[in-house]
């Protein structure tokens, strides 16, 4: 079970993604959640370790198939 903070990050990325395949910038996630970039980076790293995000080095955040299913479920509930 994910913490409420991790769920907020998943939902923010999901809402920001115009095209899921293009990914989302971590800066945009930080701005959406009104957190500092280092805080967002730590949480994104944690979500990568949980297998919900993939992140390019100095690049965009992408959902894994599992992460996308989870975010979609959160969004529709």
Regions found by a protein language model. Give the residues of each.
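Short, hydrophobic-biased segments on the C-terminal half of alpha helices
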Residues: 44-45
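A short, conserved structural fragment
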Residues: 48-58
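Short alpha-helical segment immediately N-terminal to, or the first helix within
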Residues: 18-19, 52, 74
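N-terminal helix-turn-helix DNA-binding core of bacterial DNA-binding proteins
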Residues: 2-35
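Basic, amphipathic "hinge/linker" alpha-helix immediately C-terminal to the N-terminal HTH DNA-binding motif
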Residues: 59-75
